[in-house]
């Protein structure tokens, strides 16, 4: 008599299969727990374009970081609150003496002079997102935006801006990246400062003009600057791709600049005398003001527009975004005893060595930055393309700004 055989799986094999199934379930639970822990731990989660929290981000230099955001126009009074224009003035006494706390405006970036203001364009733009992230830093050049592995350099003790963008892009759903850089690569600010010095050490009978040598310097440096700005855009795209973004998931916008000065026909102080320096903070000869407001800024903007087109990025022309509110423009005025008003005030910080820091000079002030933020919001509401913002003199920011398609080549 023989023993009966079991045609199904042996007891041992069934136990082995059960153990494998239990182990797999345990591993799945462990993986889920780790993912949940990462999601709850700040700085670790990798959500990227799938994040429930949306964001817009700015990279670049002082024009977009918020340098000059301390000021609401330019005051006629040299002390105290400076006619109500100095947002850093605190604890003012009955005699009008005040303490000054610029960190109220620039936060932690006051310490390293990146000067990211609380009204920087990316922060003041009325765009419905969860986070408005300002990574721009005063004084940055294009190389400070490149990722470190592309040769990017730290600036003011901070990593390259593209590497900072990587952390934001992993954590948030970045809808727009605004890049404003290139002016420092051609030394535009230093050249304009030289124009002011030329004005101060010469007279109307024999003026020392800057626009000839300044234009030659910009023409020499522009080819290299174009290459470096283009590399910055490549770095942004590569950073976003590494974070899981497709090109259609976000908007990449390269913006130009606005001159701090209007054309000479709008200047409210004469060339002779010292009023352009002591009253207005706009010490330029007429011919140099015309260059700064015209060919000087035009050549930089044209170069940046070509870079944007070559990179497949959008372009935002800001040459007219401060019209009627530039330094010493007779369509605006200094702030008097009535206090600041955005409709009539200048939107650019005057050249000053006695109030705040000289680094703030010739940058959009708090009003100018809010105006640029309004411009950015208008662009964001339009389809992808090339756009230009234009301000209407004598009107408040919400009424003054309009955006239009940028024509020409």
PLM features: residue spans?
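Structural recognition of the beta-strand scaffold that forms the well-ordered cores
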Residues: 55-67, 132-136, 175-180, 185-187, ...
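Conserved SGNH/GDSL esterase-like catalytic core that processes O-acyl groups on lipids
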Residues: 79-223
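Mobile gating loops/cap/lid regions near enzyme active sites that modulate substrate access
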Residues: 259-363
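Histidine-centered active-site loop/cap adjacent to the catalytic His
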Residues: 341-398
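Catalytic nucleophile-elbow at a beta strand-turn-alpha helix junction centered on a G-D-S/GDSL motif
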Residues: 54-71, 76-77, 82-86, 90, ...
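C-terminal region of N-terminal signal peptides and the immediate post-cleavage residues
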Residues: 31-54, 67, 131
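N-terminal export and membrane-targeting signals
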Residues: 5-27, 361
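Serine-dependent acyl-ester chemistry module
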Residues: 189-223, 246, 259-297
């Amino acid at each position: 008599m023989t023993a009966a055989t079991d045609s199904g799986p042996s007891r041992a094999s069934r136990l082995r299969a059960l153990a494998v199934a239990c182990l797999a379930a345990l591993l799945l639970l462990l993986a889920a727990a780790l993912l949940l822990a990462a999601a709850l731990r700040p700085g670790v989660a990798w959500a990227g374009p799938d994040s429930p929290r949306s964001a817009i981000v700015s990279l670049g230099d002082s024009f977009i970081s918020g340098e000059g955001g301390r000021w609401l126009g330019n005051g006629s009074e040299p002390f105290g609150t400076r006619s109500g224009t100095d947002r850093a003035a605190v604890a003012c006494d009955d005699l009008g003496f005040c303490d000054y706390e610029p960190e109220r405006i620039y936060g932690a970036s006051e310490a390293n002079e990146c000067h990211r203001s609380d009204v920087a364009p990316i922060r003041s733009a009325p765009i419905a997102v969860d986070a408005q992230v300002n990574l721009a830093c005063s004084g940055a050049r294009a190389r400070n935006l490149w990722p470190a592995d592309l040769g990017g350099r730290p600036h003011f003790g901070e990593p390259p801006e593209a590497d900072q963008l990587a952390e934001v892009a992993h954590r948030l759903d970045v809808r727009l990246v605004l890049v404003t850089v290139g002016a420092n690569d051609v030394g535009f600010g230093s050249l304009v400062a030289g124009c002011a010095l030329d004005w101060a050490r010469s007279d109307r009978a024999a003026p020392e003009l800057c626009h000839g040598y300044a234009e030659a310097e910009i023409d020499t440096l522009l080819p290299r600057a174009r290459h470096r700005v283009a590399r910055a855009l490549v770095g942004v795209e590569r950073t976003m791709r590494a974070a899981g973004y497709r090109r259609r998931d976000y908007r990449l916008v390269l913006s130009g600049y606005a001159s701090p000065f209007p054309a000479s026909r709008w200047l409210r102080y004469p060339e002779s005398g010292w009023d352009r320096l002591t009253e207005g903070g706009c010490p330029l000869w007429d011919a140099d003001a015309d260059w700064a407001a015209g060919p000087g800024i035009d050549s930089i903007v044209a170069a940046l527009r070509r870079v944007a087109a070559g990179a497949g990025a959008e372009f935002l022309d800001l040459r007219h975004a401060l019209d009627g509110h530039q330094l010493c423009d007779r369509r605006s005025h200094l702030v008097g005893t009535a206090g600041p008003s955005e409709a009539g005030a200048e939107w650019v910080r005057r050249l000053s060595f006695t109030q705040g820091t000289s680094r703030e000079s010739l940058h959009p002030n708090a009003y100018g930055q809010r105006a640029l933020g309004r411009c950015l919001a208008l662009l964001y509401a339009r389809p992808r393309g090339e756009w230009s913002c234009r301000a209407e003199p004598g009107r408040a920011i919400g009424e003054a700004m309009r955006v239009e398609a940028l024509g020409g080549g």
